[in-house]
């Protein structure tokens, strides 16, 4: 959540942020009104309690005639205090409810607009000219099926659309990617973590996934647990309700977990293959830093993502995501998009988000610097979302005979294998 003091002091900045996100600007005024009600009801409660305490001291000293009147007044004050307490609680709950609906403040350098209004910051690698090489590229599903690596037919039979099996070299390729990603993250100073896939509502709400993103979250209603769409959620909640020493920051974790997404609103989009699925595995980087270090940490996360994609020998571009496509928690987000030959365009493989103190305030994660205690900043970045990375590798490194060249970086994790070759049917 944002700092309420900032809302009170500069509401126009918050309105501008909501407008840039394409969200309801009237929410800001509703929150301001609720905050004023909360504060005024708090003042009234304190005044009545003070009057009640003062009256309580007078009653023992009063004459019999005065005491009867004072007791009558005390009875009325008791009712007034109780009513004021209820009013204060209701006003406080309303303000909290509205505050949780408000997205993070958009960074001033973020391009304003919707999904297509991003700005390309960098391009890396060379896009292959398959025409010059003399063959038509196959898509990842055709390649994967020929390699005995992907089985979507049985995935659909068992679980429905957007499910799949990784088999044979497909399974080995996932394990190689995960081990390589964890190795890179560990070398960079991240602590590897295997995280829960089920979390309580507070963890999901605290990370900002129960607002505009809630339609994509799986909820186990009977037990009131949520399936995570990213290990960002359990990693952000790992230090919930804790105060961390400033001299121990930054604290960096690399989480590996299954991820579950309903993909609501994507009917008919990316239905072929494993690019957009309901369940996948992912290695996620997560950082806790001092607020003043957040922007530099954001750049570091992006550099680690670029290192990863460069190591996989993939052509990719880096974009500055537009304000309407940020998600509730991020103040700024950089995506790395790999070139997908059969689609003829770049597609998102990684995201790096600066959430500044938004998640930390909601989850009560703070830092102590001397005598000062304050919310810290959290950031997250995808290192390897497995299915999409497999899509990019298969399509970009395919050869005319349907085999796929293994990037040199991955070979030690595949027993030195240089090629993935089609299997006999």
Curated annotation (Swiss-Prot):
Family as reported in the entry's similarity comment: Belongs to the class-II aminoacyl-tRNA synthetase family. Type-1 seryl-tRNA synthetase subfamily.
Location relative to the cell: Cytoplasm
Binding site for L-serine: 230-232, 284, 382
Pathway(s) the chain acts in: Aminoacyl-tRNA biosynthesis; selenocysteinyl-tRNA(Sec) biosynthesis; L-seryl-tRNA(Sec) from L-serine and tRNA(Sec): step 1/1
E.C. designation(s): 6.1.1.11
Name this polypeptide is given: Serine--tRNA ligase 1
Classification via HAMAP family: Ser_tRNA_synth_type1
Keyword vocabulary terms for this entry: Aminoacyl-tRNA synthetase, ATP-binding, Cytoplasm, Ligase, Nucleotide-binding, Protein biosynthesis
Pfam families attached to this UniProt entry: Seryl_tRNA_N, tRNA-synt_2b
Record's subunit section: Homodimer. The tRNA molecule binds across the dimer.
Binding locations of ATP: 261-263, 277, 348-351
GO terms, molecular function: ATP binding; serine-tRNA ligase activity
């Amino acid at each position: 959540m944002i700092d309420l003091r900032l809302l009170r002091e500069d509401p126009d900045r918050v309105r501008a942020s909501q407008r840039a996100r394409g969200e309801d600007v009237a929410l800001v005024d509703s929150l301001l009104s609720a905050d004023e009600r909360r504060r005024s009801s708090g003042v009234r409660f304190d005044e009545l309690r003070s009057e009640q305490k003062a009256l309580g001291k007078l009653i023992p000293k009063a004459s019999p005639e005065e005491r009867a009147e004072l007791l009558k007044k005390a009875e009325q004050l008791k009712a007034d205090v109780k009513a004021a307490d209820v009013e204060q609680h209701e006003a406080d709950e309303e303000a909290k409810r509205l505050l949780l609906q408000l997205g993070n403040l958009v960074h001033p350098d973020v391009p304003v607009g919707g999904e297509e209004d991003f700005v390309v910051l960098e391009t890396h690698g060379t896009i292959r000219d398959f025409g010059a090489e003399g063959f038509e590229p196959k898509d990842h599903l055709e390649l994967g099926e020929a390699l005995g690596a992907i089985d979507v037919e049985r995935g659909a039979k068992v679980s429905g659309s957007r499910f799949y099996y990784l088999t044979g070299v497909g399974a080995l390729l996932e394990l190689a990617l995960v081990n390589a990603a964890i190795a890179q993250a560990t070398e960079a100073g991240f602590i590897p973590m295997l995280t829960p896939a089920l979390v309580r509502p507070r963890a999901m709400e605290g990370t900002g996934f129960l607002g505009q993103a809630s339609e994509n979250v799986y909820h186990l209603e009977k037990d009131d647990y949520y399936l995570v769409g990213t290990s960002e959620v359990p990693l952000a909640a790992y230090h919930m309700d804790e105060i961390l020493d400033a001299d121990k920051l930054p604290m960096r974790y690399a989480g590996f977990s299954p991820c579950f997404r309903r993909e609501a609103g994507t009917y008919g989009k990316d239905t072929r293959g494993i690019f957009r699925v309901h369940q996948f595995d992912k290695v996620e980087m997560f950082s806790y830093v001092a607020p003043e270090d957040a922007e530099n940490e954001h750049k570091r996360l992006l550099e680690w993502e670029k290192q990863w994609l460069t190591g996989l020998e993939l052509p990719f571009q880096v974009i500055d995501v537009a304000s309407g496509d940020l998600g509730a928690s991020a103040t700024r987000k950089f995506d790395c998009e790999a070139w997908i030959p059969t689609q003829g365009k770049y597609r998102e493989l990684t995201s790096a988000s600066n959430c500044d103190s938004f998640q930390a305030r909601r989850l009560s994660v703070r830092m102590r610097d001397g005598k000062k205690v304050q919310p810290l900043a959290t950031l997250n970045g995808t290192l390897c979302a497995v299915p999409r990375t497999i899509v990019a590798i298969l399509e970009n490194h395919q050869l005319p005979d349907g085999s796929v060249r293994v990037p040199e970086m991955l070979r030690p994790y595949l027993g030195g294998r240089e090629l993935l070759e089609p299997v006999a049917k």
